[in-house]
Amino acid sequence: MSQISAKDVKHLRDTTGVGMMDCKKALEETGGDMQKAVEYLRKKGAALAAKRADKDAREGIVCIALGDDHKAGAILELNCETDFVARGEMFTGFAQELVSLALAKHAESPEAVMGLELSEAYGCEKVEDAIKTMTGKLGEKIDLKRLMFFEAQDGIIEAYVHPGSQLGTMVQLVTDQPEKAKELAKDLAMQVAASAPLVTDRSKVPAEYIEKEIEIYRQQALGQGKQEKFIEKIVSGRIEKYYQEVVLTEQVFIKDNNTKVSDVLNEFRKAHQAQVDVKAFVRYQLGE
């Protein structure tokens, strides 16, 4: 067996990010051949990924990348098994690499990004293989749980990541004054993070769902012995409260408890003689 030098072990460690002892073992198994040692470690990572496929990966981070002109954005949730790994530079760097790739290639789902090649820093591996390699390096199951891409040729995209990177949001505005709308978009991204709306406006709430809610509230009122003449008003009030909870534009603005989000949008329109509407938003919270 050829002599394995510390220099070779360090070089392999720097190249792959795998632990020193595993690098030494790989070089020993491949007779000191650096390329074969790299392939050996990749196969070992794939084998470990297969072994850990049934493990729970509930820790991780939410990561976001925005284009320089804020016309595009990508958000993802990358999972691992422990909080220790989730906070490490290797894991967070990998998450940033993935979301940057998704942004650059306009990938709209985990499936869409799996066949794409990463940068030279990750050996130009395809994402699917790189996840296996990362599993080998970190010794934990790595799972790209979800990913979404926004594009706004007719507006602007802003984002917010809460400290700790376990909650992130993106908001897409349609506006003819994108530069002036940046601060508004940032505020709305924070609004989505804090208040967790489900839809942008009332029209997005399915009519059949509201009908079911009305019947539920009606039966509850009857069960409480409310008089028939008061029930309609009670039900209407509860439906309004529901809208205020789940509809973004109906929510109380986080920066002013006396103002609704819809009022903030109207104020912007008047102040800047501009058109602005919320086209879409996304909210990722770790584990949801």
UniProtKB/Swiss-Prot annotation:
Region described as Involved in Mg(2+) ion dislocation from EF-Tu: spans on this chain: 82-85
GO annotation, cellular component aspect: cytoplasm
Claim: Oxidoreductase is one of the keywords in the record: no
Keywords: Cytoplasm, Elongation factor, Protein biosynthesis
Record-linked Pfam families: EF_TS
Positions in coiled-coil regions: none
PANTHER family (UniProt xref): ELONGATION FACTOR TS (PTHR11741), ELONGATION FACTOR TS, MITOCHONDRIAL (PTHR11741:SF0)
Family: Belongs to the EF-Ts family.
Functional summary from the UniProt entry: Associates with the EF-Tu.GDP complex and induces the exchange of GDP to GTP. It remains bound to the aminoacyl-tRNA.EF-Tu.GTP complex up to the GTP hydrolysis stage on the ribosome.
Protein name in UniProt: Elongation factor Ts
Source lineage: Bacteria, Pseudomonadati, Chlorobiota, Chlorobiia, Chlorobiales
Gene name tied to this protein: tsf
